[in-house]
Structure formats: C-alpha cells, structure tokens
Amino acid sequence: MAILDSAGVTTVTENGGGEFVDLDRLRRRKSRSDSSNGLLLSGSDNNSPSDDVGAPADVRDRIDSVVNDDAQGTANLAGDNNGGGDNNGGGRGGGEGRGNADATFTYRPSVPAHRRARESPLSSDAIFKQSHAGLFNLCVVVLIAVNSRLIIENLMKYGWLIRTDFWFSSRSLRDWPLFMCCISLSIFPLAAFTVEKLVLQKYISEPVVIFLHIIITMTEVLYPVYVTLRCDSAFLSGVTLMLLTCIVWLKLVSYAHTSYDIRSLANAADKANPEVSYYVSLKSLAYFMVAPTLCYQPSYPRSACIRKGWVARQFAKLVIFTGFMGFIIEQYINPIVRNSKHPLKGDLLYAIERVLKLSVPNLYVWLCMFYCFFHLWLNILAELLCFGDREFYKDWWNAKSVGDYWRMWNMPVHKWMVRHIYFPCLRSKIPKTLAIIIAFLVSAVFHELCIAVPCRLFKLWAFLGIMFQVPLVFITNYLQERFGSTVGNMIFWFIFCIFGQPMCVLLYYHDLMNRKGSMS
C-alpha cells in the first residue's frame, strides 16, 4: 500500500549511490512550475513540506520527459527509451550512468504500461497499415514445400513422362509449308509500303488506298489460314503461325490507319504551315515490323545502348522457364486431360473435380507463358532494338474488375484497341457500350482464329469465352463503384483460374479427340 500511496523512483547517481525521488511530488511541482513558466522542481509547498527536497538535475530532466509523455499519451514504453537519453537534447552526454538511470526509471512498476488506445495489428482498422512481408515469406515457403511434395509424388507415381522428342521431332520437318508461310508474310508490309508510296506521289486517290489496304490485310489473314488447314501440321506449329499472322495483321492496320491520319493532318496543315509534310520511310516501317509494339509511329523513344550481359541473363531465364512450362504440361496437364471426360457430358461432380484438378497446373503454365513472353522475350527484343518504351504490362494481378484486367495485362494490344478501334468508334458517335462490345468482338475473333484453325475445330469456345467477358466487365465495374470492394478481383481470379481456361482446355481437347476418332 505504501508503494501505491507514494510512487517513487530509485535513481543511480554518478558516484554509485542511490536516491529515492517521490514521483507524485515531482509531478505536482511540474504542474505548478509550468503554470508560472518555470521548470523548478524545488521550492515551498504548504501542502507538502517535504517538497523542499529537490531531485538531481539529470533525474529532473528524465522526469520531465516521462511526465510530458504521460500527459500526451503517445509514448511507446519499449521504443521511447531505446538509446538512453536521446529524447532530451544532449541526452547522450550523460554517459553510461544516465542510461542506467533511464532504464531503471522506465521499467519501475509504478510507471504506466498502457498510455493510449491502440488496435491489434490484425484488426480490421489496422490490418492494412501493417507490413505483411513475413506472412508473404511464409506463403512462399509453404508454396514451395507443397509443390515440391506434389512434384516428388508425381514422379514416384507416374515416372518421367517427358519424351525425347519434346523439343524437336521428325514430324516438325513436315511443317515446312508453315515455315515458308511465315517467311512469306514479309510480302504484305512491302505491299502496304508500295501503296503509301503511290499515294504520296499522287498516283492513286484516297478511296483506292483504302481499298488496297483492305485487300492486303484480308489476304494476309486468309493465306496462312488456308496453309494451316491444308497441311497436316503439329498444333504448336499452327499456333505459332497464326499468332504471327495476327501480329502482322494488327501492325498492317496500324500502319495504314496512322499513315492516313498523318496524311490528313499534313494536307490540312498545308494552308497554315507549309513546312508540315507527310513522308514514307521504308526504314521506319521495317523497324516497326520487328519492334515489340503494335502501334505505328514514324519514330520511337530509344535506349542508349545494348546491355549484352543483361540480354544473356534474360535469355537464360527464358530457357529455364520454357522448360519448366513444358515439364508441367507433360507431367500434369496431359495426363489429367487424357484421363478426363467431356465436361459437358456425364457426371457434373466429376466434371467439376477435373476442372479443379486442372486449374492449378493450368495457372502455372499461363503465368510462365506470360512471364516468358511479355517480360522476358519482349524485353530481350526491346533491348536488342534499343526500344525505349517497355511498358508491356501493368500490375494486372491487382485488377479490381475484369475491365481493369483487360486494360492492364497486355499493353501492346490494349494500346492498339484504344487507338484503332475504341476511340475511332467514339469519334463516329458510336455509344461507349457498343464501342466496348466491338473491341471485345475483334479480340474474340482473333482468339478463335489462333486456337480453332490449328485444331481444325470450329466450336467457338474461345470466341464465346471472350464475349462472356463483356457482361463480367459491367458487373464488376458496378460492384467496384457501388461497394468499393475487391470482389471484382476475386471474380477475375475465379474466372481466370478455376472456370475459364481449364474449361476451354477440356472442351477443345475432347472435341479434338472426338474429331480424330471420327476421322479414323
């Protein structure tokens, strides 16, 4: 009871002795001295005669600091006293004895341990203010451990399933027509350049230019489709040709559209500024056709030099992740797909189980594909060509809606869509909603071409899958605007990982197997 009635502090003096300082009396003196603009801890007090006994100067300094912290309620017991007398000016000059006195005073039972209201780190008000680096490291460790166990279990159960002809087989030699078709695609940019050269020299009119560009772009698509359908080529070879075909088509459209716009601006500026002119450069077109962009412009931001060591490291990563992607396909995806049934036929629970089992390896393959192409390959190409603008993607994994995902994950295509589809539709007085639908329609057509033509199977699964994104865009945008929550991100990941891609893989595989079975 004596301690409760009269809280005190035992301090260590410089000569090694000890003194007892009454904390309550010091606080009363502090309040009286503050009212008279003084910091006196000694004087006369009619109510407490013993207050005439003053405290040592160094103790008074530390008492002032603690009393102020106690009054403000903002001090952290553990953190405020690390480092001795740093809280007071020149506190370190007191030597080791002063630091011992601080520690002795701070951890006295009479000193308050709770000075302000605080939330738990995982409470709803404080959870997003904390650093979760440790939990992230834990998730990485658990992910590595779980997947390592699954890989070992798979190898023990099924053995090594990757065949020796995984990278190259004799069948690849039969795909030489597709290889020749890839090389011959360079004819179409030359044809587009010739058209622009003719219109520059006033040999043809604008309607003829538009008609010729339409013929060139249509032929550029139909010719590879015909070659792929006629040749009994491997699926990977067909997909490669169709992807290259789509890239060249998008570049040709951008070249024609941008050249038309520059030509229009130059013609309009002739009256006001004769120095503004339109020119055609084969060098700029050739650079554009190999540059990692789909939007044509006469010049691009360039980097200063080529970092050869950096390119070598990125190329090594490309080989490693491509091999890892092939390992997952051969060891996991192919066995799961072969041992499954058509998802639209048979037991519903069985179909759900197969889709869920396929979702994880399919996600890993997709992430590896994204990393290999959009980060490694496009950056390697940009480095070799000194291409400066390397925003090939944004943080699409944080997308709050499906619309945000489509705007962030593939920046070259997004910029092309905005530049040559979306805003031209708006300038033509087309409603915004219809312009979005048109953009998704173009994307759906090319997704279907890249998958259906190599499979020689036109079931429109890829087309419908892309068009199904349109209502999801409006739904997730509404949820984001109405509630401001991350439910849109959850819906995106569910469609992306669980429902969408695994379902399309199963649908195309079984339809392809059924077609081959009926042909044999």
From Swiss-Prot:
Segments of skewed composition (Gly residues): 81-98
GO biological process: one example: carbohydrate metabolic process
Disruption phenotype: Decreased oil content and modified size and shape of oil bodies.
Membrane topology note: Multi-pass membrane protein
Motif (FYXDWWN motif): 392-398
Tissue specificity of this protein: Ubiquitous. Highest expression in young developing seeds.
pH dependence (record): Optimum pH is between 6.75-7.25.
Keywords linked to the UniProt accession: Acyltransferase, Chloroplast, Endoplasmic reticulum, Glycerol metabolism, Lipid biosynthesis, Lipid metabolism, Membrane, Plastid, Transferase, Transmembrane, Transmembrane helix
Residues at the catalytic site: H447
Upregulating conditions: Up-regulated by glucose. Induced by abscisic acid (ABA), jasmonate, salicylate, salt and osmotic stress.
Catalytic activity: an acyl-CoA + a 1,2-diacyl-sn-glycerol = a triacyl-sn-glycerol + CoA; 1,2-di-(9Z-octadecenoyl)-sn-glycerol + (9Z)-octadecenoyl-CoA = 1,2,3-tri-(9Z-octadecenoyl)-glycerol + CoA
Bias (Low complexity): 34-54
GO terms, molecular function: diacylglycerol O-acyltransferase activity
The enzyme's E.C. designation: 2.3.1.20
GO CC annotation: chloroplast envelope; chloroplast membrane; endoplasmic reticulum membrane; lipid droplet; membrane
Transmembrane stretches, start-end: 126-146, 176-196, 207-227, 233-253, 276-296, 317-337, 365-385, 434-454, 457-477, 487-507
Activity regulation (UniProt): Partially inhibited by niacin.
This protein's pathway: Glycerolipid metabolism; triacylglycerol biosynthesis
Region (Disordered): 28-57, 72-116
Assembly description: Interacts with LPCAT2 and LPAT2.
Function: Major contributor to triacylglycerol (TAG) synthesis and oil accumulation in seeds. Catalyzes the acylation of the sn-3 hydroxy group of sn-1,2-diacylglycerol using acyl-CoA. Can use palmitoyl-CoA and oleoyl-CoA as substrates. Can use oleoyl-CoA and linoleoyl-CoA as substrates. Has substrate preference for oleoyl-CoA compared to linoleoyl-CoA. Has complementary functions with PDAT1 that are essential for triacylglycerol synthesis and normal development of both seeds and pollen.
Family according to the record: Belongs to the membrane-bound acyltransferase family. Sterol o-acyltransferase subfamily.
Extra remark: The AS11 mutant has a complete duplication of exon 2. DGAT1 deficiency alters carbohydrate metabolism.
Protein name: Diacylglycerol O-acyltransferase 1
Organism lineage string: Eukaryota, Viridiplantae, Streptophyta, Embryophyta, Tracheophyta
Gene field: DGAT1
